[in-house]
């Protein structure tokens, strides 16, 4: 019985052990193969990522270059479009010399202020004609009163002073009547105050 059990155990155990050993060998080979494939896949992924990154960078660089070129072209076109406008505005707005000439011409055209105290009054000599008691100057632009003698001049002076005083009073009254203040309203007595001021200036 003992020999039979040993024979059966060996007959059954030896093939099972051989099969297990062979399975272990194949499993180890498969594990090594899987590890190699994983390493290859990792390398391939790295290469693909590098290629994708390079392609993306190249595309981005190309887009930047194209956008910069387009912007430079647009700037050049804008500058070319603005040049005639700037030239037109410069031509149209360049007027300093014209203004200087205009100011100079206006300065020459403006008459100089002359004092009224130094007016050359013409004098009538004997033999000259008199037109209604007034003397005309050569340019026929002004009329001056006739002065013939000293007595007449003194009388004329006194009359002129009296006439001046009366005329000043009349003009003051006339201005007082015709005076119209645009800022006057119901709440101000500007005309009354002005009349009182004018009355205070009159001789008493």
Swiss-Prot record:
It is a single-pass membrane protein. It is found in: Vacuole membrane. The keyword Membrane applies. It comes from the Eukaryota. GO terms for cellular component: vacuolar membrane. The chain crosses the membrane at residues 6-26. The keyword Signal does not apply. Keywords: Cell cycle, Membrane, Transmembrane, Transmembrane helix, Vacuole. Belongs to the SKG1 family. Involved in cell cycle progression and surviving DNA damage. This is Altered inheritance of mitochondria protein 20. It comes from Saccharomyces cerevisiae (strain YJM789) (Baker's yeast). The gene is AIM20.
């Amino acid at each position: 019985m003992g020999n039979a059990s040993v024979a059966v155990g060996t007959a059954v155990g030896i093939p099972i052990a051989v099969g297990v050993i062979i399975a272990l060998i194949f499993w180890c080979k498969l594990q090594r193969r899987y590890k190699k494939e994983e390493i290859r896949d990792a390398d391939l992924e790295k290469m693909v990522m590098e290629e994708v990154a390079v392609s993306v960078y190249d595309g981005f660089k190309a887009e930047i270059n194209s956008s910069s070129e387009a912007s430079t072209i647009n700037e050049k076109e804008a500058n070319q479009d603005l040049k005639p406008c700037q030239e037109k505005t410069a031509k149209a707005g360049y007027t300093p010399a014209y203004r200087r000439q205009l100011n100079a011409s206006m300065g020459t055209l403006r008459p100089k202020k002359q004092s009224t105290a130094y007016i050359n009054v013409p004098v009538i000599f004997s033999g000259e004609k008199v037109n209604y008691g007034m003397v005309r100057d050569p340019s026929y632009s002004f009329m001056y009163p006739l002065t013939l003698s000293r007595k007449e001049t003194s009388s004329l002076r006194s009359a002129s002073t009296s006439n001046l005083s009366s005329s000043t009073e009349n003009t003051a009254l006339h201005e007082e009547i015709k005076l119209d203040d645009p800022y006057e309203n119901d709440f101000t007595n500007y005309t009354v105050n002005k009349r009182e001021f004018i009355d205070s200036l009159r001789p008493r």
